[in-house]
UniProtKB/Swiss-Prot annotation:
The active site is at 112 (n6-amp-lysine intermediate). Its cofactor is Mg(2+); Mn(2+). It comes from Helicobacter pylori (strain ATCC 700392 / 26695) (Campylobacter pylori). GO terms for cellular component: cytosol. GO terms for molecular function: DNA binding; DNA ligase (NAD+) activity; metal ion binding. Zn(2+) binds at residues 400, 403, 416, 421. Its EC number is 6.5.1.2. One of its GO terms (biological process) is DNA replication. This is DNA ligase. Residues 577-656 form the BRCT domain. NAD(+) binds at residues 32-36, 81-82, 133, 167, 306. The gene is ligA. It comes from the Bacteria. Keywords: DNA damage, DNA repair, DNA replication, Ligase, Magnesium, Manganese, Metal-binding, NAD, Zinc. DNA ligase that catalyzes the formation of phosphodiester linkages between 5'-phosphoryl and 3'-hydroxyl groups in double-stranded DNA using NAD as a coenzyme and as the energy source for the reaction. It is essential for DNA replication and repair of damaged DNA.
């Protein structure tokens, strides 16, 4: 909280420094959430002391200044930034101010993409200039680089002068690949996709931009001479020119509809192809927009409804080591608890000791932590400017934390080689029951942990000796649940050979390699290293891993194959796939279903379907539960076949 004019001036200077690093240098010093918190405190102080507002306050200007790297270029019409709202009450207040004066107003809602704003100027149907937002009045001319963005049309079917505005982004998938390349090359990593997009767009060498797989998603227009009546009409016109459509776009009439779409976006956020940080809300009627006008910095007819933060700063207070099924040791940081998106986070993965060394992460460091859905949070980088001498190196362990067996230290990974290590056995069983292995429904991590604690199982063979009374000893198990699990275990017998090979959890051998091996018959694992090397796609590491695994586990493998009697081919499974209406079809699931979506997704994948998180013209089926949200409207718009849960179950039953 700012208490004096002196603190107010200091806060302005600090926020301007943060903005410079974020917008101009592409090197954020703090997370978006921390910046927003500091900014809101500044704004609150100014609301109480309006006579003392400084012209250089970040509340009075749009984020970036132009640098010396590119020529400056003015926008024909100013590019504004949006005011933020952070909760229901702030949104309600914003809506009431508009609806009180304009009760008939409607609102266009769309995802707020976390990228770099770009203004494209077209004259006589040709792209003539591309300019970053900059300070809103002028930006940096990046035309050569923009022309390397694949989905920006160089020509459009409209001859008038028009500015088309949108966000330059990099998909999560391409961002991860880019950072992996930089890690391998010992280059500094991008902090997040937004900074990767900005750094890639503002390259002096446009060939680098070309390689970065940037995308442009339009969200509006600047200067033009068209007679639109609504904002939605304007967006539809942009798409008709050949630009990408905005996914999850919706037209809403009241607070509840807006909230529903906001929470739909939060639910779909993790599966969305790009990083989102909120939802943009814009008054649809252009005559109302004109009457509402602008503040010093922002339009009064639009706002950004921000998501809860997924990125925070905290301190590493310790490191523990976990053991995987292959024996690989994964270091996990113990953190000072920090709330991220409604969850209290107290640990995050450090991946491996090679990465710790490359990123120069130390014990007692302040670090940037991100959370992605239900996956364990991860540490992006240390904040070296916070170091005070109390930090020290995170040492590689020499013995297994579970069985105390001496560890093998390779260049990247550290391994426990004890095949009877309890941690390895437990993780092996979790993999054995997983969806790409034997797919035993109801046999998840927590159940396997309980079975180990009760000393009911020690390896996969023990699963098939379990009795009803054994399972009744487990927490929350009653007769029906216990019987269902026994039935699922029994059903896993006679699996396709590739599934059983994959279930063994052999290092370097995944689903694809298992399918290749299965083509060579039931005795394939007895082959020599030379014979494995002759197989398509198999290298030295894979061949040696297979030979070593079989040599160490011959008796276990023979017993397991005898008990489960795998099918020599998966012809039955492939036949079911090929006869399935869902084979090679793209399917999206939405809304509330009677079973978890993941369970239906697995059933459909087993029938050859491809599961997607977003609806497009390429979607074949939408499975719609209760409260399907905007995906249903989008599916209907694209002519996608829509099935409710009852219809889906009927079709699945027909395939049995």
């Amino acid at each position: 909280m700012i208490k004096s004019q002196k603190e107010y001036l200091e806060r302005i200077a600090y926020l301007n420094t943060l903005s410079h690093h974020y917008y101009n240098l592409d090197e954020p010093i703090v997370s978006d959430a921390i910046y927003d918190e500091l900014y809101q405190e500044l704004k609150a102080y100014e609301e109480k002391n309006p006579n003392g507002i400084q012209a250089n306050s970040p509340t009075q200007k749009v984020g970036a200044t132009t640098t010396n790297s590119f020529n400056k270029n003015p926008h024909l019409m100013r590019m504004w930034s949006l005011d933020d709202v952070f909760n229901q009450s702030e949104l309600q207040a914003w809506l009431q101010r508009i609806l009180k004066a304009y009760p008939s107003a409607s609102f266009v809602c769309s995802p707020k993409l976390d990228g770099v704003s770009l203004n494209l100027l077209y004259q006589h149907g040709k792209l003539v200039k591309a300019t970053t937002r900059g300070n809103g009045l002028e930006g940096e001319l990046v035309s050569a680089n923009a022309k390397h963005i694949a989905n920006i049309p160089h020509a459009i079917a409209y001859n008038g002068e028009i500015e088309i505005r949108g966000e330059v982004i990099i998909s999560k998938k391409d961002f991860d690949a880019l950072n992996q390349e930089r890690l391998n090359a010992n280059e500094p990593l991008f902090a997040n996709p937004r900074n990767a997009a900005s750094g890639s767009l503002r390259q002096l060498d446009s060939e680098i931009t070309k390689k970065r797989k940037l995308q442009f998603i339009p969200w509006g227009v600047g200067k033009h001479s068209l007679n639109f009546l609504s904002f939605k009409e304007c967006l539809d016109f942009i798409v008709s020119l050949g630009f990408s459509a905005i996914q999850y776009l919706s037209l809403n009439k009241n607070h509840q509809e807006i909230e529903d779409n906001y929470h739909t976006l939060i639910r779909e956020r993790e599966g969305f192809f790009a990083l989102l940080d909120g939802m943009v809300i814009v008054v649809n009627e252009l005559n109302i927009q004109k009457e509402l006008g602008y503040t010093q910095k922002s339009p009064k007819f639009a706002c950004a409804y921000k998501f809860p933060a997924l990125e925070k700063h905290t301190k590493i207070v310790g490191v523990i080591n976990q053991v995987g099924r292959s024996g690989a040791i994964t270091p996990v940081a113990l953190l000072e608890p920090v709330e991220i998106a409604g969850a209290m986070i107290n640990r995050a993965t450090l991946h491996n000791y090679s990465e710790i060394e490359k990123k120069n992460i130390m014990l007692s460091d302040r670090v940037v932590v991100i959370r992605s859905g239900d996956v364990i949070p991860k540490i992006i980088k240390p904040l070296e400017s916070y170091r005070d001498g109390s930090q020290h190196k995170i040492e590689r362990p020499k013995v297994c934390p579970i069985c105390s067996h001496e560890l093998l230290c390779e260049e990247i990974f550290t391994y426990c080689q004890n095949l009877n290590c309890p941690a390895r056995l437990k993780e092996s069983l979790i993999h054995f029951a997983s969806k790409d292995a034997l797919n035993i429904q109801g046999l998840g991590d927590k159940v396997i942990e309980q079975l180990f604690e009760e000393k009911l199982i020690f390896n996969a063979l023990d699963l098939y000796a379990l009795k009803l009374e054994d399972l009744m000893r487990l927490d929350k198990f009653k007769i029906k649940k216990a019987q269902n699990l026994l039935d699922a275990i029994l059903k896993s017998k006679n699996p396709p050979l590739w599934r059983l090979i994959n279930a063994l959890g052999i290092e370097h051998i995944g689903k694809g390699a298992s399918k290749t091996l299965a083509k060579y018959g039931l005795n394939v694992l007895e082959k020599s290293e030379a014979e494995f090397l002759e197989m398509e796609g198999f290298g030295v590491e894979m061949a040696r891993s297979l030979v070593n695994f079989y040599a160490s586990n011959q008796e276990f493998i023979r017993s397991l194959f005898e008990l489960l009697n795998p099918k020599n081919s998966d012809m039955a499974e492939e036949k079911q796939k090929s006869s399935s209406v869902f084979n090679n079809k793209t399917i999206v699931l939405t809304g509330t279903l009677s079973k978890p979506r993941q369970e239906y997704a697995q059933m459909l994948e087993n029938l050859g379907a491809k599961i997607s998180s977003s609806v497009s013209a390429k979607t074949d089926f939408l499975i719609a539960g209760e409260n399907p949200g905007s995906k249903l409207a989008l599916a209907q718009k694209h002519g996608v076949s829509v099935l409710n849960e009852e219809e889906l179950l009927k079709r699945l039953k027909e395939l049995d």
